[in-house]
Amino acid sequence: MPEIRQLSEGIFEVTKDKKQLSTLNLDPGKVVYGEKLISVEGDEYRTWDPRRSKLGAMVLKKFDIPLKRNSKVLYLGAASGTTVSHVSDIVSEGAVYSVEFAPRSMRDFIGLASRRKNIFPILADAGKPDSYAHIVEPVDVIFQDVAQPNQAEIAARNAVRFLKKDGYLLLSIKARSIDTAASPKEIFKEEVK
């Protein structure tokens, strides 16, 4: 029988043949991106590939992930929903406001969102938070995963508009989207300022 170890609220390590990062599946029987489903004593866990998810990689690196069962999350750069689906599992009684700019990615994402009561897909430019302010309530966590040269500015705009006092901003800086020639270390240092 697989062993379950809770790493943080809603995030687990399931050991069946090997250790695998997992979340409790909010949509039993359904996969999102080809991940494995593991059933243990009536619960179904979805494996979470940290090579396909920056947030998953953060968990493996032992970052404190500030997501709780009832958290309200603004996810900027939802793409087709790989990581958003795991956030949805974790914040099962909360909400995931998921902003994506690309219509093609959003088309794929809509199918996932239609099966999960806590995902709210928003086709919009994350750099223009006022355009979706009528949809998004104040949030506990903002996770940004956009590939724009002004990533830090976009994060700051959204934080000012939506982040609750004592909320958390998780910013995934994509150095090559900012400058293809500069040293990533220098870019990171500059963006954090």
Curated annotation (Swiss-Prot):
SMART domains: Fibrillarin (SM01206). InterPro entries: Fibrillarin, Fibrillarin_CS, SAM-dependent_MTases_sf. It comes from the Archaea. S-adenosyl-L-methionine binds at residues 82-83, 100-101, 125-126, 145-148. Involved in pre-rRNA and tRNA processing. Utilizes the methyl donor S-adenosyl-L-methionine to catalyze the site-specific 2'-hydroxyl methylation of ribose moieties in rRNA and tRNA. Site specificity is provided by a guide RNA that base pairs with the substrate. Methylation occurs at a characteristic distance from the sequence involved in base pairing with the guide RNA. Interacts with nop5. Component of box C/D small ribonucleoprotein (sRNP) particles that contain rpl7ae, FlpA and nop5, plus a guide RNA. It comes from Methanosarcina mazei. It is an enzyme of class 2 (transferase). Coiled coil: none annotated. Belongs to the methyltransferase superfamily. Fibrillarin family. Its EC number is 2.1.1.-. Keywords: Methyltransferase, RNA-binding, rRNA processing, Transferase, tRNA processing. GO terms for biological process: box C/D sno(s)RNA 3'-end processing; tRNA processing. One of its GO terms (molecular function) is histone H2AQ104 methyltransferase activity. The keyword tRNA processing applies. Pfam families: Fibrillarin. This is Fibrillarin-like rRNA/tRNA 2'-O-methyltransferase.
